[in-house]
Amino acid sequence: MSLLLRPYESVFVVFGETGVKCGKNRRMYARKTGEVVELPAKGWEISVSRPLAWPEFTRTEYTETGSLAAPGRLPEFSGTVRYRMQFEARAGRAVLSLGEAYEAVQVWVNGRKAGDAICPPYLFFLEEGMLQDGENELVAEVTNTLAKAHHDNVFDRYWVQEPTGLLGPVKVEYME
């Protein structure tokens, strides 16, 4: 068995009487073709859902990736932020990179689940058939912690808060 992990990555390997169960061979480390589709930072549909409201989302006025914790945006928001974008691409195997995100992420491409990540790297293998020629849809849900909703705690008051949401850059890199 061969195993290659990037920083922060982990896997579970279960040994038993029937052999080793490793799940799908994701081949995330296949060679890149050099073809990249970069998704713009602007033009996203961004919706939010607070923990007790989930799975109901409310659309925001924001349309650009970047920290929603910035002053004048949603600095006290705790919950899930949904990012939706239509983009042009071709069919093929690829890796979707979300760049930076805070914290846990779930991703769908054209309605198919691409995966989950609780820490960087926010990379998702897009199997053959997930991307189609022409218009595609990416949905990424980024969930932060409850720290921002409870920042008035005397112990947390002076801590520097992490960003909220999808910071990017977001890109699709094609694989052989």
List the model feature ranges, each with a label.
Residues 1-23:
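C-terminal beta-strand-rich structural cap/linker in extracellular carbohydrate-active enzymes
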Residues 1-3, 123-129:
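Exposed aromatic-hydrophobic patches
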Residues 5-7, 91, 132-133:
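Surface-exposed loops/turns
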Residues 11, 94, 134-136:
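Exposed beta-strand face motif in extracellular beta-rich ectodomains
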Residues 20-81, 128-176:
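An acidic-aromatic loop/edge-strand motif
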Residues 77-88, 122-124:
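Short beta-strands within extracellular/lumenal beta-sheet-rich domains
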Residues 87-110, 138-141:
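Aromatic-lined ligand-binding clefts that engage carbohydrates, nucleic acids, or primary amines
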Residues 114-115:
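Short hydrophobic beta-strand segments in globular cytosolic domains
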